[in-house]
Every structure is written in structure tokens, then in C-alpha cells.
């Protein structure tokens, strides 16, 4: 047959590199969640400001806001 069996002792594990060793501490907090609300209120404020920004852009695009000194054709 054309199948080949590989023994467990012939396979090598993951290779260790300098970059991997430097980045490992960054991944050590994976899956952990800080208790409480954290930065949720800050994100809510950012989303509200972004929504206001988008509505202003939309009103300017629809020419529903008249800007002094700027002619909209």
C-alpha cells in the first residue's frame, strides 16, 4: 500500500525561537476577563461620539445643514 506510518518518537515538537520566547508573555493572559465593567463606559462614549459624527456627515452630504460661506452645488 501507499500509506506510511510515522512513529511518535520521530516527530519533533514545536520549535522554540527567540521571537516566540519574547511574545509568549503577551499570550499568557489569554481568556482572562477582568472583573467589573472595565472600559465599557468609555467605549459607550466613543460609540456615541462616532454616531454623532456620522449623523453630521450624513446631514452635510444631504445638504440639510447650510454652512455659511460654502456653496453646495
Swiss-Prot record:
Record-linked SUPFAM superfamilies: Photosystem II 10 kDa phosphoprotein PsbH (SSF161025)
UniProt protein name: Photosystem II reaction center protein H
Residues annotated as transmembrane: 41-61
Annotated GO biological process: photosynthesis; protein stabilization
Subcellular localization: Plastid, Chloroplast thylakoid membrane
Cellular component annotations (GO), alphabetically ordered: chloroplast thylakoid membrane; photosystem II
UniProt KW keywords: Chloroplast, Membrane, Phosphoprotein, Photosynthesis, Photosystem II, Plastid, Thylakoid, Transmembrane, Transmembrane helix
Residues with Phosphothreonine modification: 3, 5
UniProt-recorded Gene Ontology molecular function terms: phosphate ion binding
Membrane topology: Single-pass membrane protein
Organism: Glycine max (Soybean)
PTM notes: Phosphorylation is a light-dependent reaction catalyzed by a membrane-bound kinase; phosphorylation occurs on Thr residue(s) in the N-terminus of the protein.
Domain of life: Eukaryota
